[in-house]
Curated annotation (Swiss-Prot):
ATP binds at G30, E31, N32, A33, Q34, G35, K36, T37. HAMAP family: RecF. The keyword Cytoplasm applies. Gene3D superfamilies: P-loop containing nucleotide triphosphate hydrolases, RecF/RecN/SMC, N-terminal domain. It comes from Staphylococcus epidermidis (strain ATCC 12228 / FDA PCI 1200). One of its GO terms (cellular component) is cytoplasm. The lineage of its organism: Bacteria, Bacillati, Bacillota, Bacilli, Bacillales. GO terms for molecular function: ATP binding; single-stranded DNA binding. PANTHER family: DNA REPLICATION AND REPAIR PROTEIN RECF. Keywords: ATP-binding, Cytoplasm, DNA damage, DNA repair, DNA replication, DNA-binding, Nucleotide-binding, SOS response. Its main location: cytoplasm. This is DNA replication and repair protein RecF. The RecF protein is involved in DNA metabolism; it is required for DNA replication and normal SOS inducibility. RecF binds preferentially to single-stranded, linear DNA. It also seems to bind ATP.
Length: 371
């Protein structure tokens, strides 16, 4: 897939701008705080109906404006399609081909993106919450079923936590409702857990040769899914898995009542990256962590193409010039002539000349694209 045009109205520091996009590489050059990252963010937001930089949509609306609008025309193998996102201080509206979508699960997946920014090192060295969000953002783009199952799980988790809190403080004493919630909870917890486990295996298979290539076969990368629900046999039938998880919850019912919170489930999952058998979060150098993050991002690109049949759009926010020649070479081999890429940078120095030869440059200054 390709983004042909991007139009912004009252988005961040942009009053009104239209970007005619190059099908291969688009390089956004400018000093800091001029709006380069805002442009990349708008593409990400158009794809996932949420920003990666803020959870408050109101922050996306230009100062003293009542609304923000993002519109993009996409090209697929089978044709073109417009996507629109309209944001007000009361909420947001999304459209596919000019038709409003009542649920975000119907919208997400029409535009797939992979973002690589300096903070993506936190996927390796940050908290479990960051890694869970990474899994959900990437998996949600390629599976509407997963996105729906995750939403159902989060809804039931919230209900269960509310009831556990009432039991803890004595507002409720009957655990019958909790047993009903656990039945629903287990159904979706298993769906999320099993899909995540499969996703991590697929990602590992694709990331390992990429990582080996970047390190000249000096390092081996493995990914370990660390689920909160440690199932004895992931291949068991559904009824056996449900019985196993229900037994776990029943055995820990008193602990959950005392704590007033759900102690088991995908909301407590983690993911471990290991380089030569050592946990990269604890023992990896910054170079190893950067290589691991890059390998994962490049593997995401390939996985999305396998699952969706279209390459995603790659967003590189101020990271290209930080990659050494070896890493840039492997990045180039992945994206060249296949993946439309948007790059932000303060200078083109240090960017591979082959990337520059297939690029269109845009100079960004104070929320405007200079011709």
């Amino acid at each position: 897939m390709k983004l042909n045009t991007l139009q912004l109205e009252n988005y961040r520091n942009y009053e009104q701008v239209t970007l005619d996009c190059h099908p291969e590489v688009n390089i956004l050059i400018g000093e800091n705080a001029q709006g380069k990252t805002n442009l990349l963010e708008s593409i990400y937001t158009l794809a996932l109906a949420k920003s990666h930089r803020t959870s408050n949509d109101k922050e996306l609306i230009r100062f003293k404006s009542d609304y923000a609008k993002i519109e993009g025309e996409l090209s697929y193998r089978h044709g073109t399609m417009p996507l629109t996102m309209f944001i007000t201080k009361k909420g947001k509206q999304v459209k596919v081909n000019h038709l409003e979508q009542s649920r975000l699960t119907q919208y997400i997946g029409h535009l797939n993106v992979v973002l690589f920014a300096p903070e993506d090192l936190n996927i390796v060295k940050g908290s479990p919450q960051i890694r869970r969000r990474f899994i959900d953002m990437e998996l949600g783009q390629i599976s509407a079923v997963y996105l729906n199952d995750l939403a159902q799980y989060q809804r039931i988790l919230k209900q269960k936590n509310n009831y556990l809190k009432q039991l803890q403080i004595g507002q409720k004493t009957d655990t019958t409702m909790l047993e009903v919630l656990n039945q629903q909870f287990v159904e979706y917890a298993l769906k999320v857990t099993l899909r995540r486990e499969h996703f991590i295996k697929e990602l590992e298979t694709l990331a390992q040769p990429i990582h080996a290539g970047i390190t000249n076969d000096q390092e081996t990368l493995t990914l370990d899914y660390v689920p909160s629900l440690k199932l004895s046999n992931y291949e068991a039938n559904q009824s056996e898995l449900i019985e196993e998880v229900l037994a776990l919850l029943n055995d820990n019912l008193q602990r959950e009542k005392e704590r007033g919170v759900c102690l088991y489930g995908p909301h407590r999952d983690d993911l471990s990256f290991n380089v030569n058998g050592m946990d990269a979060q604890t023992y990896g150098s910054q170079g190893q962590q950067r290589t691991t993050a890059l390998s994962i991002k490049l593997a995401e690109i390939e996985l999305m193409n396998i699952e969706v049949g279209e390459y995603p759009i790659l967003l590189l926010d101020d990271v290209l010039s930080e990659l050494d020649d070896s890493r840039q070479t492997h990045l180039l081999s992945t994206i060249q002539h296949k993946v439309q890429t948007f790059v932000t940078t303060t200078s083109v120095e240090g960017i591979d000349h082959e990337i520059m030869n297939n690029a269109k440059l845009y100079r960004i200054s104070q929320g405007e694209i200079l011709k």
